[in-house]
Every structure is written in C-alpha cells, then in structure tokens.
Amino acid sequence: MESLRIYNTLARDKQVFVPRQSGEVRMYVCGITVYDYCHVGHARMLVVFDLVQRWLRAIGYRVTYVRNITDIDDKIIRRALENGETIKSLTDRFIGAMHEDEAALGIQRPDIEPRATQFIPQMLGMIEKLETNGYAYQAADGDVNYSVRKFANYGKLSGKSLDDLRAGERVAANDAKEDPLDFVLWKRAKADDPQGASWASKYGMGRPGWHIECSAMGCTLLGEHFDIHGGGQDLQFPHHENEIAQSEGATGQTFVNYWMHNGFVQVDNEKMSKSLGNFFTIREVLERYDAEVMRFFIVRTHYRSPLNYSDVHLDDARASLTRLYTALKDVQPDALALDWNEPHAQRFAAAMNDDINTPVAVATLFELAGEVNRTCDASLARQLKQLAGLLGLLGREPRAFLQQATGAAQAGGLAADEIEAKIAARVAAKQAKDYAEADRIRAELLDAGIALEDKPGGSTEWRRV
C-alpha cells in the first residue's frame, strides 16, 4: 500500500505523512462553540475529520483523536442572558443536541472531548509562561494580550505578513492594546457578567480568550508537539495562526507538524454563515433527508473543495446512495476479511492515501456496485460493503434503507402498510387477469415515489425513489 500523503496547509503542498512516534497519531480538531444547534458547516467538519481518523485507524495507526468543545465565549454568555438561563444549562443542552446530531450522521466520538471550562488552570499556566517569555502583557483595561510583533514567525501558516494584516478580524480593535494586531489571552471580567462566566487569576477575575483555549487543551492532552491539527478553512486565520504563536511562544518548540483544513459549505456560491442568513441546521436537513444521505453528500466531495449545498445536490446524493444499496439488495456478501491486494481495494486505498480523496474512493464503490449488479458475486458485494464501511456508509440492511420514508415521503407519502395493501390489490388484479388495473396500481405507486420489482416466484418488492 502506498504511503499516506496529506495536504499540509503549513507547507502549502501534499506531504508524506510521517508521525512523530512510529505507529501512533495524535490529532486535535477545533470543535464547536455550543450556543445553538449545529449547522451544515459544522456537519462537514465533523464528517471530514471522522473520515480522517477512520482512515488512519484502517491503515494501522493507533490514534488519539481530541476534538474540543468551546463552552465559554461571548456568544454563549449573550445567548444565556437572552434565554434567562445559566451558562451551564445552555451549553449542556446544546452539547447533548450535538451528540444526537453526530450519532445520526454516523460520526464516531473522539477519544477525548475536552470542554474549555475544564482547563482554565492550564490556560492560565500557559499565559504566565508567555508573560515570562516576553510575549504577553496586561493592558490598562485589565485584559492580558499577546504581543504579535514579538513572535518572529507570525503569519507562517496563513502566509500573511504583519504589514498586510489589519485589526478587526475576529478581534475588535482596542485602544488599550500596545498594537491593534495584538489579541486577547485573558479577558477581564465585566461587572454585569453572569455567574459562571469568570474565574480567579493573578490578573483578576476573568475568562480565557478563544485562541488560548485550544493551545492549552492541545498541549495538555497531546503534548507540546503533536502530529495533526484540523479545522475549518475559516479557522486558518486568525485562530490557528494565533494558536501557533501562543504554543510556540510558550514552549519554544514546533507546535504541530501537519495542518488540515476543510473547505467552506456554499449556498449559491456564497459561504454558508449565520451572518448571511443562508445557513441550515443539521436538524432542519434531517427533517427532509435521511442522515446517511447527508453524510454521503458530504463524503463524495473532496474535503478541501467547496461543498455546494442545495436540494438538487441532496436529491442526487439520495439517488446515488440508493444505487449502492440496490446493488446489495439481492446478494449476500461472503464473510471473508478485507484483502488489500484485491484490485478495487487497492484503488480505494490509493485514493484515500492521496490526501483523503473521497471522490475517487466513492467512484471505486460505484465500479464495484456495477460489477455486483452484473455478476451477483458475493465476494464483490463483501468488498463493496467493507470499503463503504470505512467511509461510514452502507451499514444498514439494504431493504430497510430502500423502503424508508425520506424527503417527500416523510411529508405525506404512503406508509409501508398502505404500500403493501396496494401491492396486494395489484396481485389480486393480476390473478383476475385485469392487467390494466395492475398497471394502473403500479403507475399510481410510481407517481407516489414507490418503485415495484416483480421477483421470480410471484413476489413483489418495493423501494422508495
């Protein structure tokens, strides 16, 4: 099998992946700020790095996968005040909702899922190191800031130079800062902050800045120098750039070897975002589409490419996934183990080892499905199911998927017992040689999104289309 190659944002190129410790991978991914339901952009990040960790394990690595939860933030505080509830009540509720969405999408839970509020002492410890090393200062307003110009390599991840940067990207300009580009490490508490929004420190009561949270959790849980750091493309700057400055400023060593970023989700060629009002929650999508359809919709696009969200694309994903399940409907896979020397498995592995190239990997699944349809070969069916399983797909009994109510069927389509009743009426019409009535019932069902397949022996199977 070829070596895994990953596009490293830091190098701006694909590189052969070489872990710091042979056979082991330590990976950190920036998770979700839990003040609302997860949207499709979150779903993409969750699925993408679920695929990465699944593949790393599939090719034999022992993986420690950390994905954090931001459970203290200005947005969280505002939402809790608006709702008249405590910060913990709000964050616990949306963490629970996130876990439900993850389970629906077939996302395996990370090995460690730290909450920012569990690591306040470690964050303060890192801030004190930065102060000792000359990178941090307490401003007149009580905030502790990072002195960006003190870090010689600032901009190495994003490719931005200090002269080209402007204040205001995710961090508002502040007259108390020594430089407008400086960012906050510790926010001084405000008089009207609610309970649970601040902690005692040598700098006074306050709470951590967003960037220091991930630096402290990553270094504490994975070590000061680890293999992979991932997140959405929008986090490349300033969040990940600031993580590097903080971590390397505190420890004096390289923070992360490989940086991976997934692309945006777009609607009509614009980034999906709350500010533009063009976003959809995972739950809104799952009211209309099966969760595996949504996962397949994400999987079949390369993780670094834009993902264009539309009903047309989701409908196409549903039709494509239906084709894969249909290939397995009448063929029982054999029980042999996956053999990576099999040609389809080799092509699949080559694709996944080429920067997690899921479009090519999915194309291999369709090649297999076509051969299963032609040959009804049990070993090919097994390969299809096994390889798809590495992508978190085709895990259900085929007929169960094909007969489920999704999309329009959920919004008032025929229930299973109604379909069976119409099939029985069609059988009766055929037995009475009333073939016109039998054809009428078939056409009526097709209009309702139900396709019939007459099997040898006189039975009839159905599926939703």
Curated annotation (Swiss-Prot):
GO terms for cellular component: cytosol. ATP binds at K274. It is an enzyme of class 6 (ligase). Pfam families: DALR_2, tRNA-synt_1e. It is found in: Cytoplasm. It catalyses: tRNA(Cys) + L-cysteine + ATP = L-cysteinyl-tRNA(Cys) + AMP + diphosphate. Zn(2+) binds at C30, C214, H239, E243. Keywords: Aminoacyl-tRNA synthetase, ATP-binding, Cytoplasm, Ligase, Metal-binding, Nucleotide-binding, Protein biosynthesis, Zinc. GO terms for molecular function: ATP binding; cysteine-tRNA ligase activity; zinc ion binding. A motif ('KMSKS' region) lies at residues 271-275. A motif ('HIGH' region) lies at residues 32-42. Binds 1 zinc ion per subunit. One of its GO terms (biological process) is cysteinyl-tRNA aminoacylation. It comes from the Bacteria. Its cofactor is Zn(2+). Its EC number is 6.1.1.16. HAMAP family: Cys_tRNA_synth (MF_00041). Belongs to the class-I aminoacyl-tRNA synthetase family. Monomer. This is Cysteine--tRNA ligase. It comes from Burkholderia ambifaria (strain MC40-6). The gene is cysS.
